[in-house]
From Swiss-Prot:
Cited InterPro entries: Fmt, Formyl_trans_C, Formyl_trans_C_sf, Formyl_transf_N, Formyl_transf_N_sf, Formyl_transferase-like_C_sf, GART_AS, Met-tRNA-FMT_C
EC number in record: 2.1.2.9
Enzyme class, broadest EC rank: transferase
Keywords of this entry: Protein biosynthesis, Transferase
Natural source organism: Burkholderia pseudomallei (strain 1106a)
One function term, GO molecular function aspect: methionyl-tRNA formyltransferase activity
Gene name linked to the record: fmt
PROSITE patterns: GART (PS00373)
Organism superkingdom: Bacteria
SUPFAM superfamilies, alphabetized: FMT C-terminal domain-like, Formyltransferase
NCBIfam families in the record: fmt
UniProt protein name: Methionyl-tRNA formyltransferase
Amino acid sequence: MTHSLRVIFAGTPEFAAAALAAIHEAGFPVPLVLTQPDRPAGRGMKLQASAVKRYALERGMAVAQPPSLRRAGKYPVEAVAALDLLHATPHDVMVVAAYGLLLPQEVLELPRHGCINIHASLLPRWRGAAPIHRAIEAGDAETGVTLMQMDAGLDTGAMLHEARVAIAPDDTTATLHDKLAAAGARLVVDALVELERTGALAATPQPADGVTYAEKIGKHEAALDWRKPAAALARQVRAFDPFPGGAGTLDGATLKLWAADAVPGRDDAAPGTIVDIGPDGVVIACGEGALRVTQLQKPGGKRLPAREFLAGAPLAVGQRFAPADAA
């Protein structure tokens, strides 16, 4: 099936590529794709194209990679060229998903039907850069995807559609990301079909109550504070997989802790102390309960199940991880 609604797409990572693929496969014409410039990545730090760029080029779509869209910003020449291209490209709506660049008012007002953003939370909860991580870290039972009509604020636009997704007890940011990417892809296609059929989407202003912000994840957040309850640390480990991971410092070496669950603890063990070691994992005392770590990684090594890790890097009951503020 083909459609007449012309969609300019703006996005960068895999989350966005899933939406672009769904839009393209549904038969909507995509005259232009915007994505971030190629970035150094990997061990060799070679320039790599974004997931969106790779998908678009494989299917013969036109791609633009401006470093900015602000006429008065750091890259005015590139921004003006990109804006001229947008003005010259006939389209009806822009779909934005994890693009990574601010859209000036000029761009927001350019499409006949405005700009629709795919956001990975149930707004107004978890506005901002890291909604998937923060939902898991906070212990939310569910999250979802919201389509919103973009305005000049940070994820403050009126809501158009939403899809709810349960957070499983073993979900990591990686697994939940994939669920939300698939949900967002389905949601945006349904919305575009409705927009083409009816000419408008019903918009509901976001409520003033329940607003929270998902701050960008920093590498420093990997350090586990053993004084916290084990349940909170288990959520932190899941939330920070694949980035930045959980981390603990033992005898001066930083170990990455990739999978863990909360288990009953011992009252006589100081937080951070290894209280048990077995094939099922390394059990570490916490402020409340204990954390059983089932997947670890030593510096320069690979992430391994506890049994394999212990075969090459023996640990001992009584060893103690350094406090987070001393690591």
